[in-house]
């Protein structure tokens, strides 16, 4: 196969439908909008959730819960991602950010226990799940809360 032989796959490219261009096109006159009414007008249509004047479902249901302003959002990382570091490395939130293991520090870093850790590491983080702490210590490393 050569570059000049490449063709788009069947059905992946579709021609634009030009409406209002004569009755023979199948989309002339009313351009597929039917006769009159709110939806036939320019800019016409109803907002999402509108039920024709009936009290919409989202307004019939009670409000629930609240947003906790004191919530702390942690950058989470699993144990299997820590295997990319060399044996004996001191893993800090700054190092994780530098290497791209996490994209933002947020309120801190939490280490979760998914995966298997095969290296002895000193891990410093704001929080550890119980299983993560256990696995780090089982691998001969230490888990320090900062």
From Swiss-Prot:
Pfam families: Ribosomal_L27A (PF00828). One of its GO terms (biological process) is translation. Keywords: Ribonucleoprotein, Ribosomal protein, RNA-binding, rRNA-binding. One of its GO terms (cellular component) is cytosolic large ribosomal subunit. Binds to the 23S rRNA. Belongs to the universal ribosomal protein uL15 family. This is Large ribosomal subunit protein uL15.
């Amino acid at each position: 196969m050569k570059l000049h032989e490449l063709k788009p796959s069947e059905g992946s490219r579709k021609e634009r439908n030009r409406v209002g261009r004569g009755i023979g096109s199948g989309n002339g006159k009313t351009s597929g909008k039917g006769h009159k009414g709110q939806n036939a007008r320019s800019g016409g249509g109803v907002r999402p959730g509108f039920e024709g004047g009936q009290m919409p479902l989202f307004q019939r249901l009670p409000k629930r819960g609240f947003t906790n302003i004191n919530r702390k959002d942690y950058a989470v990382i699993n144990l299997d991602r820590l295997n990319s570091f060399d044996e004996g490395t001191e893993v800090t939130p700054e190092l994780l950010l530098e290497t791209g293991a996490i994209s933002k520090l947020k309120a801190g870093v939490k280490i979760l226990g998914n995966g298997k850790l095969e290296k002895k590491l000193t891990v410093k983080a704001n929080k550890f799940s119980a299983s993560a702490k256990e696995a780090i210590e089982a691998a001969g490393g230490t888990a320090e809360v900062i």
